[in-house]
Regions:
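A cross-family phosphate/adenosyl-ligand binding-site feature
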Residues: 1-118, 124-213, 217-394
Length: 394
């Protein structure tokens, strides 16, 4: 995933330094080249050998270490780096960088870098909220540094407040957004729908489907990592929303219709991956419907055709993609959908194929355009998302 990319991790003196060992391991598993720089204070919290074991590269602490290859190491690393993350970043190191002080391997490397630099402060709440620290962070923002807001939680000092280093998964997302993909969607607005809809019968019961939202969430995440400004209109799911994405939660098909159509005019690309109910109860009972000995019937009415509406009202420059979930005649039905709803692409799923459809992390799809059909092998849903976006931007 990150083969050929170089990530420099700067670790300062903080109890949260242990998290960066896990982050380094995660990056190595993605085939990134990882280099770790530590301040001397950081070595009081975690041993450099830990990072050297995980990354298979020398962990640098002292600018004048005699055991180095003949090159000016801070400059050499600065030239290699695709992204630099300083985490946890102490108030001391933040102040040094903001003041232009370069007196150790970490600060000299940061000063020499021209790549994206990200800082994740971690400290006591009062220190973080100190006007001097806030001024330094604002100064760094002005110079193009990205600042990750600390999490709120229970701190090492036994206080509860802002200052906690975010999870490794959050830190990883900031790195991936910068270096995982070329930014071929930069400047584009992309709307993705995901998940099921829920159609109420009474206050207890509802009609829904098996969609988990995984495919739509993967599309939103990959589009964001490729530089798009992403809006994710999501039915009820148990997934963590992708970072840097504007999430619009909805429940019913009518909710989704309103959320999508009110935002469609400003979008460059619309991908409708949600499994929207075709029918909804004609009336919703105010109270729970009691069980009886006889049969029960529920009158259903058609929901609004969101994709049909989008196809009829799209602009000439907009790109529109829909999904087709089929158990038979997949290609024939999907081609009809492509034509009838004025789409640029239909992503066809055969739900009878193992490893495809709802609730799994893989998918097997066929991409259908006006030029023809292309069947993809079984792939992760993020890989499928990449293939879909590749097709849409060709």
């Amino acid at each position: 995933m990150l083969k050929g990319k170089t990530v420099v991790l700067g670790v300062t003196g903080s109890i949260a330094a242990y998290k960066i060992a896990n982050l380094a391991s995660m990056l190595v598993k993605m085939h990134a080249q990882v280099h770790v720089l530590m301040t001397k204070n950081a070595t009081n919290f975690i041993n450099p050998i830990t990072f050297e074991t995980l990354t298979s590269t020398k962990c640098l602490v002292d600018t004048f270490d005699r055991n180095f290859q003949y090159s000016v190491e801070h400059v050499a690393l600065a030239k290699q780096a695709d992204v630099v993350l300083i985490a946890p970043a102490s108030a001391n190191v933040i102040g040094k960088i903001a003041g232009g002080i370069a007196d150790d391997m970490l600060t000299t490397t940061v000063m020499a870098c021209k790549c994206k630099k990200i800082i994740a402060p971690a400290m006591n709440t009062n220190m973080y909220e100190n006007p001097i620290v806030q001024d330094n962070l604002e100064k760094l923002r002005h110079y193009g540094y990205e600042i990750i807001a600390p999490a709120v939680g229970y701190l090492a000092c036994k206080d509860v407040g802002a200052g906690k280093l975010p999870s490794e998964e959050v830190l990883l997302e900031y790195i991936l957004r910068e270096i995982r993909f070329e930014k071929d969607l930069e400047g584009k607005k992309v709307l993705v729908t995901a998940g099921p809809t829920v159609e109420a019968i009474d206050p207890v019961r509802f009609i829904s489907n098996r969609s988990t939202g995984k495919m739509g969430y993967a599309l939103a995440r990959v589009a964001m990592q490729r530089g798009a400004q992403v809006t994710l209109v999501s039915g009820p799911v148990s997934l963590e929303p992708p970072p840097f994405v504007d999430v619009v939660p909805v429940e019913s098909a009518e909710d989704m219709f309103q959320a999508v159509t009110s935002r469609m005019a400003e979008q460059d690309i619309i991908i409708k991956a949600a499994a929207v109910a075709d029918y909804t109860p004609a009336t919703v009972a105010d109270n729970k419907i009691k069980k009886t000995d006889g049969e029960a019937a529920i009158a259903l009415t058609r929901t609004k055709d969101i994709l049909g509406y989008l196809g009829e009202h799209r602009t000439e420059k907009q790109i529109l993609c829909g999904f087709s979930m089929e158990t038979e005649n997949m290609l024939e039905n999907s081609r009809k959908k492509l034509d009838k709803k004025h789409l640029d692409l239909v992503v066809a799923n055969n739900l009878k194929v193992e490893g495809a459809g709802f609730g799994v992390d893989t998918n097997v799809v066929t991409l259908i355009t006006r030029e023809g059909a292309r069947e993809l092998p079984k792939m992760t849903k993020e890989e499928v998302a990449g293939a879909i976006l590749d097709t849409l931007v060709e």
